[in-house]
């Protein structure tokens, strides 16, 4: 089960932040303990500033967290980092809510606009854009044709319903 969660976290990090944070996240997941940024930098053979930059990006999305203590000898703060494996469900729910909001915004855009499309390059324009260009494609000059976005709206409505049901199920399971 841990392998699945680790992979899920890596996939999420890759989707949100790209490939460069995976080395630091993988290292934290593999070690299963709290580590300082200096320890990670030494083991990964990377500059401490690079590791910190990646850790801050991961923390911003809730994938890692830290505990801060003061070094008694130097008086400096030491940060101990760990992967938030135990919070993966909350992270996934949060991500689904973000996607849901984007889909709802897109549905509203599709519902509140009339569209025209270029038959050549398939670029879609709102009525206002088409009107400004005299219903000709600004790229190639071809006459724009009316585009019925009913299928797109149906698709978005279906996806919104699916994600809302998933969120409701997962919220119910999480609270029981």
UniProtKB/Swiss-Prot annotation:
Keyword DNA-binding set for record: yes
Family annotation (Pfam families): TFIIE_alpha (PF02002)
Gene Ontology biological-process annotations: regulation of DNA-templated transcription; transcription initiation at RNA polymerase II promoter
Annotated ranges, domain HTH TFE/IIEalpha-type: 5-89
Keyword Secreted annotated: no
Disulfide bonds: none
SMART domains documented for this protein: TFIIE
GO molecular function: DNA binding
Keywords for this protein: DNA-binding, Transcription, Transcription regulation
Function: Transcription factor that plays a role in the activation of archaeal genes transcribed by RNA polymerase. Facilitates transcription initiation by enhancing TATA-box recognition by TATA-box-binding protein (Tbp), and transcription factor B (Tfb) and RNA polymerase recruitment. Not absolutely required for transcription in vitro, but particularly important in cases where Tbp or Tfb function is not optimal. It dynamically alters the nucleic acid-binding properties of RNA polymerases by stabilizing the initiation complex and destabilizing elongation complexes.
Entry's free-text remark on domains: The winged helix domain is involved in binding to DNA in the preinitiation complex.
Family: Belongs to the TFE family.
Subunit note: Monomer. Interaction with RNA polymerase subunits RpoF and RpoE is necessary for Tfe stimulatory transcription activity. Able to interact with Tbp and RNA polymerase in the absence of DNA promoter. Interacts both with the preinitiation and elongation complexes.
Name of the protein described by the UniProt record: Transcription factor E
Gene assigned in the entry: tfe
């Amino acid at each position: 089960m841990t392998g699945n969660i680790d992979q899920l976290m890596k996939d999420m990090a890759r989707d949100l932040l790209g490939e460069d944070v995976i080395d630091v996240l993988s290292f934290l997941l593999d070690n299963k303990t709290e580590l300082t940024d200096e320890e990670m930098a030494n083991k990964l053979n990377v500059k401490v500033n690079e590791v910190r930059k990646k850790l801050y990006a991961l923390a911003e999305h809730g994938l890692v967290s830290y505990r801060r203590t003061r070094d008694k000898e130097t008086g400096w703060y030491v940060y101990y980092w760990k992967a938030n494996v135990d919070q993966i469900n909350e992270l996934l729910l949060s991500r689904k809510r973000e996607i849901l909001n984007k889909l709802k915004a897109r549905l509203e855009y599709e519902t509140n606009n009339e569209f025209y499309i270029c038959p050549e390059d398939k670029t879609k324009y709102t009525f206002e854009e088409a009107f400004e260009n005299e219903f000709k494609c600004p790229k190639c000059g071809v006459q724009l044709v009316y585009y019925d976005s009913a299928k797109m709206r149906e698709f978005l409505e279906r996806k919104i319903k699916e994600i809302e049901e998933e969120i409701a199920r997962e919220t119910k399971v999480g609270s029981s």
